[in-house]
């Protein structure tokens, strides 16, 4: 999300045919199954010496075309005059993003955080491919190992879901408050 928002903002500000072509390529990449990128990611992590590390798995999730496309589409709904007025007031594009764009796209960012966290939390193939040490692998793989024993599968699955449920409740409440705040402000 941290890399996707500035990228989407750049695409929003530079509105030409090349930008539209790049957004279309992002749409096409979103249509590909994520397993296609396993081998290039494996080769990259191997060359950097980051196999069998948790940082290597996190590194493969740092950029998402889903975030870029969704934030770009959300930004298209913002009136450009707000951004242009903010750019006239300050020379820093970071301040424009932080003080003008981020409060406006807060509901979208929160929803994307929820989707990205759930996707990362339920990740199966990447930890299996990139991490061989069982102690470093995530809970999904642990539960699949516990499923072999049978008795502990359902309690482990319930415990596994607790962080997702808590984050879901917090994020949904924040999204509702953001949307209600926007409605009251108008």
Residue spans for each PLM region:
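A structural signal for multi-pass alpha-helical bundles of membrane permease subunits
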Residues: 1-186
């Amino acid at each position: 999300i941290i890399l996707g928002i500035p990228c989407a903002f750049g695409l929003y500000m530079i509105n030409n045919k090349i930008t539209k072509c790049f957004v279309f390529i992002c749409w096409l990449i979103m249509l590909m199954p994520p397993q296609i990128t396993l081998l290039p990611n494996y080769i990259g992590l191997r060359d950097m010496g980051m196999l069998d590390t948790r940082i290597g798995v996190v590194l493969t999730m740092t950029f998402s075309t889903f975030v870029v496309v969704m934030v770009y589409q959300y930004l298209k709904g913002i009136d450009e005059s707000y951004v242009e007025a903010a750019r006239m007031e300050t020379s820093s594009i970071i301040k424009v993003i932080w003080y003008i764009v981020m409060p406006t796209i807060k509901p979208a960012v929160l929803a994307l955080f929820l989707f990205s966290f759930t996707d990362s939390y339920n990740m199966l193939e990447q930890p299996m491919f990139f991490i061989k040490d069982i102690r470093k692998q995530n809970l999904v793989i642990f539960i699949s190992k516990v499923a072999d024993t049978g008795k502990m599968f359902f309690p482990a699955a319930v415990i596994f879901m607790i962080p997702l449920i808590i984050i879901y409740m917090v994020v949904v409440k924040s999204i509702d408050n953001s949307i209600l705040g926007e409605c009251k402000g108008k």
